[in-house]
Regions:
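Short proline/glycine-enriched turn/loop motifs at strand-loop junctions of beta-rich domains
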Residues: 263, 324-328, 375-383, 450-456, ...
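Acidic/aromatic-lined carbohydrate-recognition and catalytic surfaces
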Residues: 1-99, 105, 138-159, 503
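Aromatic-rich carbohydrate-binding modules that target alpha-glucans
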Residues: 392-402, 450-494, 506-516
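Short, compositionally stereotyped local motifs that mark structural "simplifiers"
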Residues: 352-438
Length: 548
């Protein structure tokens, strides 16, 4: 696994064990969530130039050969080496973009197809994945994705074809429209609107009229069902001063508000979810309530530099999404009621929804808060009734005008109903838990016996880098299980924090380092291995062996 995969059927990695992965997928399924596997099959790592691992699964041994490597791999460098070594490559050239540093594999090869189909069936039928995210599909013909999807019977797939809109549409066609694709141009539309300028530049103010673009999959009724829309991902996010990439420079919530109101299949960036979970949950709830799908139609209502408004028609109701510096001044359209608002965004639900709306979602919170109750109704003057003890509200329960705030001071079950002409309708239930987060500390242990790095450094970060490379020199050790373990104490200071770490041999060109180890929240044990993923050393997570 990983971006330069060597093994297909071994799912133990620096992220955790195969057993932990299976447990996670099972828990997702129980919650009605399908897991999508990141499938990297354009290229594959080798031992030396040509040797792929032999892997036995269910009594069958699968192994790619040197003749499965594209003839012109690495711009012909591999062929030159093969001629020197007397090794044969495939007679077929690469079907797409060449990837340097790994062997580009020939998807026309029957052996390659056999191995990959077995691998994908293992992911779906054995591990339990629901779908696939095909990485770097510019490297091989889209017809193979159709073949692989047919062979595995996978429920869903999306391809990463990072290019212009016409080429993405052509790739979708090559898959016989059996796969979705990431809508990169949608992302660039949003970036340019937020930044106020194109190509990653930043103007003094945003220009939300730049959202009015036909250069995306989402605008086209024939392709929007295949569009996986997003506003940020791992390749565009800011990582460090040395790896700034192409992030949104402001208005993250407004960008997501637009994303979640529009057709296509929206994909939320995980760091955004962690940072803005309550707000994003409410946006998702509004999308679902209106019945907005990947095929919904929309019409523009306002297209100005400081205000952009679309009306989106769902299968149940309509939703107005307003974004821009003047979104707070926008009063909506006749027949709509504002249900959500924040910095530079607002949602309005059509009054035929006939429902109450609460602008703070169910969940756990560290302290009490206020939530606004809104009556969405075609009846003027409709009010709301509510209870905080889980009982069903009646016309005699506590009554409030639409748009009023109520206080949630402790754990409770809030039930809210729409009160129209003395009748209580469409009662909604919200579960709130108020529990203060207690900061805590935990240990990160590492064993470097296999690589014998001296000195050994530990570079840690949370949301952003807070220390300079190479981090803190590790000097303290413990003997556990007959092995010497270096260790470092770290802290979690709030409920959304994660700790990330890289072990390394110090600063300087050519100094070795491990792969990134991300998302730690509790004591963990890692062994640095001699094998590499690209130029970085792999680590083995052995936490389960020691945290007993």
């Amino acid at each position: 696994m990983g971006y330069m995969p060597y093994y297909y059927f071994n799912q133990n990695s620096s992220f955790g064990s195969e057993a932990e992965l299976r447990s996670l997928i099972t828990k997702f399924k129980a919650a009605g969530i399908g897991a999508i596997a990141d499938v990297v099959i354009n290229h594959r790592n080798t031992e030396g130039w040509y040797t792929f691992p032999a892997e036995t699964y269910k009594g069958v041994t699968y192994q790619m050969q040197s003749t499965d490597i594209c003839k012109n791999d690495d711009g012909g460098t591999t062929a030159t080496q093969a001629a020197t070594d007397g090794v044969s490559l495939s007679q077929n050239n690469d079907e797409g973009t060449d990837f340097g540093g790994c062997r580009d594999i020939d998807h026309k090869s029957e052996n390659v197809q056999k191995v990959i189909k077995a691998y994908l069936k293992y992911l779906k039928d054995d591990l339990g994945y629901t779908g696939f995210r095909y990485d770097m599909v510019k490297g091989f013909d889209g017809s193979h994705v159709a073949d692989y999807n047919d062979a595995t019977g996978v429920e869903y797939s999306v391809g990463e074809y990072w290019d212009g809109n016409d080429k993405i549409e052509s790739w979708i066609n090559r898959t016989n429209k059996k796969s979705a694709a990431f809508d990169f141009q949608f992302r660039y539309n949003v970036r340019d609107a937020v930044n106020g300028a194109a190509n990653g530049k930043v103007a003094t103010s945003s220009d939300w009229s730049k959202l009015n673009s036909n250069d995306n999959l989402m605008h086209d009724a024939n392709y929007r069902r295949y569009a996986v829309t997003f506003v940020e991902n791992h390749d565009t996010q800011y990582r460090s001063a040395d790896s700034q990439n192409d992030p949104l420079k402001r208005d993250t919530l407004a960008a997501n508000a637009y994303l979640l109101a529009m057709p296509g299949t929206p994909c939320i960036f995980q760091p955004h979810w962690r940072d803005y979970k309550p707000e994003l949950k409410e946006m998702i709830a509004a999308r679902k309530y209106a019945g907005i799908t990947n095929m919904s139609n929309y019409a523009n209502k306002k297209c100005q530099k400081t205000l952009y408004v679309n009306e989106v028609t769902g299968t149940k109701h309509k939703l107005l999404v307003a974004v821009g510096n003047d979104a707070d001044k926008y009063a909506g359209e006749t027949g709509y009621t504002k249900i959500l608002s924040g910095y530079h965004y607002a949602y309005f639900l059509s009054n035929d929804a006939e429902t109450s709306w609460t602008d703070v979602p169910s969940g756990s919170y560290e302290e009490g808060f206020k939530t606004t109750l809104t009556a969405v109704s075609q009846t003027e003057g409709a009010k709301l009734v509510y209870t905080l003890d889980g009982s069903t509200p009646t016309a005699k329960s506590t009554t409030v005008e639409s748009g009023k705030e109520i206080s949630i001071n402790g754990t409770c079950t809030l039930k809210v109903g729409l009160l129209v002409n003395g009748e209580v309708r469409n009662i909604a239930t919200h579960q709130y838990t108020i529990e203060k987060f207690n900061a805590y500390k935990f240990m990160i242990y590492v064993n470097a016996d296999a690589v014998k790095w001296s000195p050994l450094y530990c570079y840690t970060w949370k949301k952003a880098a807070s220390v300079e490379w190479p981090g803190e020199k590790m000097t303290e050790t413990k003997t556990i299980g007959g092995k010497t373990w270096y260790y470092k104490e770290v802290s979690i200071d709030n409920a959304t924090e994660l700790v990330n770490v890289i072990f390394n041999n110090g600063s300087g060109t050519g100094k070795p380092q491990t792969v990134d180890i991300t998302g730690l929240t509790s004591t963990a044990y890692f062994e640095i291995e001699t094998s590499k993923e690209g130029k970085k050393y792999k680590v083995k997570d052995v936490t389960a062996e020691y945290n007993k």
